[in-house]
Each structure stands twice: as C-alpha cells, then as structure tokens.
C-alpha cells in the first residue's frame, strides 16, 4: 500500500518508519530542510529488531505537498488547528485523510477527516481508529492489518 505521512516531527518519523517496516511505500512530507534519511533508516532498523520482521518497504521525502498523490494520508503536524487546516488545504485530494491528533476534535480539522491515532512510543500495540466519513471496507481492512 502507498501511504502519505504529513509532518516529519517525532510521531511523523515514527509512523513513517513503522509503515516502511511493515513493507509499505511511504511519502513523508516535511516543510523543513532537516536531513531525515539517516534518522529514518535508524528508526526502521530499531523497529525491524523490535517486531522481528524485515519487509522491503521504502520511503521518499517530499518537500512539495502538491506532488503528493491520493493515497492513505496521515496528518501528523503540530497540535495547532490553524496549521493542520492549512496543511490539509494544500492537498489536491480530499478523501482518505486521517489525523493523528490526540487533542483536537476531528470535526474542527475538516469535514472529511478521520482519526488514526498512534500511541507514543510507536511500539505500543494500540491504534485508535475514529471513523467520521465513509471510506471503503477495503481500506479499513488494510488499516487493521
């Protein structure tokens, strides 16, 4: 599955690394010039060791949000409503967008936003899925797997 992760802070890096470890192709959008390649490779190695798996996922760091294509998209930017809305408004698509927020109401972020909240640290085997907008059962099954 192809996945977009919006935001390269602590949780964004962790979520990206987790999906790569699970064998997915991840586009990680960042709005900074931080060099992430080595950081992500280190995180992926840690998760491979923790979960005792080594799937062949990959990641691509994207600086231009307009280049992201419609895929499962997880927003992980800072817990600031204005910033979340601004980032999401720059996407060229409006479906299959999930937020990792833990403190902002999904309805305040946007009409089409669902929740996909990962715990910290990412190795905690618990994910909160909040369904607000209809999405396909196929996508739901992929999320659960």
Kindly label every feature range from the protein language model.
Residues 1-50, 60, 112-113:
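NAD(P)+-binding Rossmann beta1-loop-alpha1 motif at the extreme N-terminus of oxidoreductases
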Residues 1-3, 71, 127:
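Nucleotide donor/acceptor-binding cores
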Residues 15, 84-85, 107-110:
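Short glycine-/acidic-enriched loop or helix-start segments at secondary-structure transitions
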